[in-house]
Design a protein with these regions (language model features):
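Positively charged, low-complexity intrinsically disordered leader regions
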Residues: 2-38
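Eukaryotic N-terminal low-complexity, Ser/Thr- and Lys/Arg-rich leader segments
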Residues: 1-15, 318-339
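Glycine-rich phosphate/diphosphate-binding loop of Rossmann-like nucleotide-binding domains
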Residues: 47-59, 141-262, 272, 288
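Short glycine-/small-residue-rich Rossmann-like dinucleotide-binding loops
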Residues: 102, 254-257, 277-278
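A short, aliphatic-rich alpha-helical micro-motif
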Residues: 91, 244-246, 266-268
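Rossmann-fold NAD(P)-binding glycine/threonine-rich loop
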Residues: 110-143, 269-328
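Phosphate/diphosphate ligand-binding glycine-rich loop within oxidoreductases
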Residues: 70-156, 285-286
Length: 339
């Protein structure tokens, strides 16, 4: 006679897939696209042999075509990438430019980020956009007014923000700009493209952020009681990842390579865990500790790319239409704040 074993208790962890979050954002993007006279044209430049970059390019192409956007992938030798970007800057048929990094894996990549025309920079990597982001400036225009042009935020950090909004980590009772007040967040990655900008965005919205890389831990905050308009950075002398993790409600990790794993024992019970690396930074046991686990963010990043493309289109006033709803939803990070 077979023995009957009691049913195992259901997992207390909710796994949220990027595709689920992306669906709602895609609906907004479609609204914005439909009011334009012609589909915006995004051009991607691939100058490396990175399989992850090619996969991202393929996802971008599919998402564009499925949602009424034009997309062209241009594969060029890295020695020709500078001239290709300069030509794209003055091509009136191109509305947005994305470059799949890394190419040179050094300061040359940073230089390339700066030569993309600001009016076509869907990735938000131009100096003006980066300066505005760190200084918590949301507009390109200095004076208030109905025609103010909004600054572009980097795609991957903004994708994480959109996921946090979907997960209701942002407290909508609080005013815009303070909605992460009371949250303590760990960002494991301090790259200039993703990790540091993400820490700055989270801190500018009120969170206490521990930014971690191989050199140690930095704390990003707006000070006690959010007295500062934008974040400040303090070195946490002697701290390592294991010192920061137990304090954090949210853990966001994006370390490249298969060897790095977050120690599940260091996570707070009920933490929200988000992985933005191409590899899995969390072990399968994360579901035993986390309340919410997001294993990847790629599909959200691509939708954010299209939202940025719509915003560039709006900023350039090509079609003289009312700003697309896709980039104007109230209660989000990008909403108008008159303060």
């Amino acid at each position: 006679m077979a023995t009957t074993t009691p049913n195992a208790a259901p997992s207390s962890c909710k796994v949220v897939l990027a595709g689920t979050v992306a669906k709602g954002l895609l609906a907004e993007v479609s609204e914005g696209r439909e009011i334009l006279e012609k589909p915006p044209h995004l051009v991607g430049f691939l100058a490396n042999n990175d399989p992850a970059a090619k996969m991202y390019a393929d996802w971008t192409e599919k998402t564009c075509k499925d949602n009424g956007f034009r997309y062209t992938l241009r594969e060029v030798h890295r020695d020709d990438i500078e001239d290709a970007l300069l030509a794209a800057n003055v091509d009136d048929d191109i509305d947005g430019i994305i470059v799949y990094y890394p190419i040179f894996n050094n300061r040359q990549d940073q230089y390339l980020q700066q030569i993309v025309d600001i009016s076509k920079d869907v990735e938000g990597l131009s100096h003006r956009y980066i300066f505005n982001m760190y200084q918590n400036i949301r507009f390109l225009d200095p004076a208030p007014g109905p025609e103010r042009q909004k600054s572009i935020l980097p795609c991957t950090p903004l994708a994480v923000i959109k996921i946090l909004e979907y997960l209701q980590i942002y407290n909508t009772i609080l005013p815009y700009g303070n909605r992460l007040f009371g949250r303590t967040i760990c960002v494991v990655n301090r790259s200039e493209v993703v990790g540091r900008p993400l820490a700055a965005l989270l801190a500018n919205d009120g969170a206490r952020v521990y930014s971690v890389d191989v050199t140690g831990v930095q704390q990003f905050t707006r000070g006690e009681g959010l007295k500062r308009r934008h974040h400040e950075v303090v070195e946490m002398e002697g701290w390592k990842l294991e010192d920061a993790l137990p304090h954090c409600d949210v853990v966001i990790s994006g370390v490249p390579g298969d060897s790095f794993k977050i120690d599940n024992k260091l996570l707070r019970q009920g933490a929200v865990c988000i992985n933005f690396s191409s590899q899995k930074n969390f072990t399968p046991e994360v579901k035993e500790k986390a309340s919410i686990y997001v294993p990847a963010i790629g599909k959200v990043t691509i939708v954010v790319l299209l939202r940025n493309l719509l915003r560039l289109n709006q900023n350039r006033r090509l079609d003289n239409v009312h700003p697309a709803e896709a980039v104007e939803k109230p209660g989000t990070l990008e909403s108008v704040r008159n303060s």
